[in-house]
């Protein structure tokens, strides 16, 4: 018998049946486990992505929180510096005012001391002048004066000296 060039042979049918059986076996034994592995891997990747997104959002929230805390700290620091500057200026003003008051007190005391010293010197000069006048008058009169005459001469002399000024 001659074999046909194109035809279905038993070998070909067995190969197709064997291929189909191997396909079913592989599908039953390998396809589902591989599919489960792929599905598991896909779920792991999705959960990792979700965790990454969650961590990113938490990081952004923490960043915003830290930035707000930093801004608050900066504002608080500036307020502290401002208050310290105000207190320093007030203290400086108090010190300057106290120094001015002390200077005025010292100046007034010095003026008072000068006036007292001036009066003292004037009184000493008056006494010296009256002694000199008495001495000159006694030389002129050549006699001693009694106390009442002496005081009268002194007062007249002082009046004349005061008017001469």
UniProtKB/Swiss-Prot annotation:
Gene3D superfamilies: 6.10.250.1580. The chain crosses the membrane at residues 5-25. GO terms for molecular function: proton-transporting ATP synthase activity, rotational mechanism; proton-transporting ATPase activity, rotational mechanism. The keyword Transport applies. Keywords: ATP synthesis, Cell membrane, CF(0), Hydrogen ion transport, Ion transport, Membrane, Transmembrane, Transmembrane helix, Transport. Its main location: membrane. NCBIfam families: ATP_synt_b. HAMAP family: ATP_synth_b_bprime. F-type ATPases have 2 components, F(1) - the catalytic core - and F(0) - the membrane proton channel. F(1) has five subunits: alpha(3), beta(3), gamma(1), delta(1), epsilon(1). F(0) has three main subunits: a(1), b(2) and c(10-14). The alpha and beta chains form an alternating ring which encloses part of the gamma chain. F(1) is attached to F(0) by a central stalk formed by the gamma and epsilon chains, while a peripheral stalk is formed by the delta and b chains. PANTHER family: ATP SYNTHASE SUBUNIT B, ATP SYNTHASE SUBUNIT B', CHLOROPLASTIC. Belongs to the ATPase B chain family. This is ATP synthase subunit b. It comes from Clostridioides difficile (strain 630).
């Amino acid at each position: 018998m001659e074999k046909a060039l194109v035809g279905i042979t038993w070998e070909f049918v067995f190969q197709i049946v064997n291929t189909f059986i191997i396909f079913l076996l592989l599908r039953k034994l390998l396809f589902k486990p591989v599919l489960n592995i792929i599905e598991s891997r896909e779920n792991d990747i999705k959960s990792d992505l979700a965790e990454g997104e969650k961590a990113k959002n938490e990081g952004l929230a923490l960043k915003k929180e830290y930035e707000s805390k930093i801004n608050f700290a900066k504002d608080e620091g500036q307020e502290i510096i401002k208050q310290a500057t105000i207190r320093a200026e007030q203290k400086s003003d108090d010190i300057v005012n106290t120094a001015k008051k002390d200077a005025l007190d010292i100046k007034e005391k010095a003026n008072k001391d000068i006036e007292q010293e001036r009066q003292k010197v004037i009184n000493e000069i008056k006494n010296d002048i009256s002694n000199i006048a008495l001495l000159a008058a006694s030389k002129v009169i050549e006699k001693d004066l009694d106390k009442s005459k002496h005081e009268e001469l002194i007062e007249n002399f002082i009046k004349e000296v005061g008017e001469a000024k």
